[in-house]
């Protein structure tokens, strides 16, 4: 089975490893630095109180001259342009950066306000970020926003229990100028790893299987991993060498996903 290799993030031209790193769950700097040396170069700095590990990892790697190999994405949930800019710049300073590769407008299930987008595009024009992204749970919105031509990539929820993007988003984000696609919640907040939530007689999949599921879809450039510690980071890494799921394993993941979704409808 072929391993997952680095790829280009949509039309951005950025070279990315297939397994991305999310900051918010508390993993130490060592976990992120170890993953970087194994090809994980997409650093997603979202919300949460447990981001110190990634901040330190970014500082450490930049001090070693690795900045050009890193893709750093900073997300803001602010709905007002002035607040979005304030928090974005504060996050840059916290990591000792003059520029982020990507600014993400976070959790928009409706079109973000024109004023907010204009403020974000102004930051891009000033060189504080190179590309603009958007995240949200309304899958049908992404093709609409792509058609507007203002966003370079999207963060889209996708896992074995939430497969709607296969019909509502991915087929409509294609072509030479397609936006990059980064997926998140690969383990459905851990539910796809919980042996108590499995179909009767079905063992829980390995964490790496959840990341392999997402990365097996040809539309997906990067699948985010949010480790709480270095052990969880290491549990995810086999996905890179194992590569795409075979047909039998893919059907198993879908079967588990359908069961988890039908028995846990909260999300």
Regions from the language model: what does each represent?
Residues 3, 28, 106-267:
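Beta/alpha (TIM)-barrel catalytic core signal, keyed to glycine-rich beta->alpha loops juxtaposed to Asp/Glu
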Residues 16-28, 73-83, 196-204:
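Active-site mouth loops of central-metabolism enzymes
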Residues 55-77, 122-127:
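Alpha-helix-loop-beta-strand connector modules within alpha/beta enzyme cores
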Residues 2-7, 53-59, 84-90, 138-140, ...:
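Alpha-helical scaffolding within the catalytic cores
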Residues 1-68:
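N-terminal binding-site loop/beta-alpha segment at the start of enzyme catalytic domains
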Residues 24-30, 45-55, 77-84, 108-114, ...:
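Acidic-and-aromatic substrate-binding clefts and catalytic sites of carbohydrate-active enzymes
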């Amino acid at each position: 089975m072929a391993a997952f290799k680095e790829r280009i993030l949509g039309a951005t031209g950025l070279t990315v490893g297939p397994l991305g790193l999310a900051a918010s769950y508390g993993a130490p700097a060592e976990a992120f630095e170890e993953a970087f040396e194994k090809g994980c170069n997409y650093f997603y700095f979202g919300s949460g109180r447990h981001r110190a590990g990634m901040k330190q990892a970014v500082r450490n790697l930049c001090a070693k001259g690795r900045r050009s190999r890193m893709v750093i994405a900073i997300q803001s949930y602010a709905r007002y342009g002035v607040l979005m800019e304030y928090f974005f710049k504060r996050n840059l300073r916290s990591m000792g950066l003059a520029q982020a590769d990507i600014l993400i407008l976070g959790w928009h299930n409706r079109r973000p306000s024109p004023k907010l987008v204009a403020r974000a595009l102004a930051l891009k024009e000033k060189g504080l970020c190179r590309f603009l992204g958007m995240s949200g749970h309304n899958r049908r919105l992404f093709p609409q926003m792509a058609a507007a031509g203002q966003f370079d990539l999207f963060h889209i929820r996708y896992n074995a229990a939430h497969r709607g993007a296969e019909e509502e988003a991915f087929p409509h984000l294609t072509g030479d100028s397609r936006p990059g696609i980064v997926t998140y919640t690969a383990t459905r907040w851990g539910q796809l790893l919980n042996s108590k939530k499995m179909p009767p007689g079905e063992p829980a999949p390995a964490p790496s299987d959840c990341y392999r599921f997402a990365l097996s879809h040809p539309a997906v450039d990067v699948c985010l991993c949010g480790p709480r510690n270095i052990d969880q980071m290491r549990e995810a890494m086999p996905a890179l060498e194992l590569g795409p799921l075979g047909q039998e394993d893919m059907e198993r993941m879908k079967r588990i996903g359908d069961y988890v979704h039908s028995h846990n409808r909260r999300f």
